[in-house]
């Protein structure tokens, strides 16, 4: 079967980010500058949302818009999803995709773990991650895809513009 539901977390390490020497405008837009690739991945795997209900709370000196995010929705394919992030607490990026027989866990995003139905065990899946270890994870293949001839799998500007509507909903609550 296919995806029956999914969830994702885009918690950022505020204690580290506040120390970074970045322009204030970059930090004020940190969700767009650094967190959206997690959201992109979740919606790439689970499907594009047709409805999102979003909540936000808190705020930080360097990111006053919000520091805690929570929400849920349904995709164009009628798959339910939820998300959360708390930039004031410990956490990490992650995506979990559920099917009728498996829970696929991307935490860290570069690794795949699987939990099978009827088991509480979670096992790492061996994947060819040589390029991710040699270069920044995902960068080599993304660059290769960018320069490939013919149809590639990168999103178009029009698709990115549509994705930005989802990012705005998540950010604005």
Task: Explain the meaning of each model-derived region.
Residues 1-55:
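Predominantly a Rossmann-like dinucleotide-binding segment in NAD(P)-dependent oxidoreductases
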Residues 4, 91-96, 115-120, 124:
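A short, polar/proline- and glycine-enriched secondary-structure boundary/capping micro-motif
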Residues 18-22, 123-125, 142:
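Short, basic/glycine-rich phosphate-binding loops at helix/coil junctions
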Residues 26-32, 126-137:
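A short glycine-threonine-serine/GTX helix/turn-capping micro-motif
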Residues 33-111, 143-151:
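Contiguous beta-strand/loop segments that form the cofactor/metal-binding neighborhood of enzyme cores
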Residues 106, 130-144, 155-158:
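Active-site loop of classical SDR/Rossmann-like NAD(P)-dependent oxidoreductases
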Residues 116-117, 127-129, 144-148:
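An anion-binding loop in the catalytic cleft
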Residues 144-173:
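C-terminal helix-rich "cap/oligomerization" subdomain common to oxidoreductases
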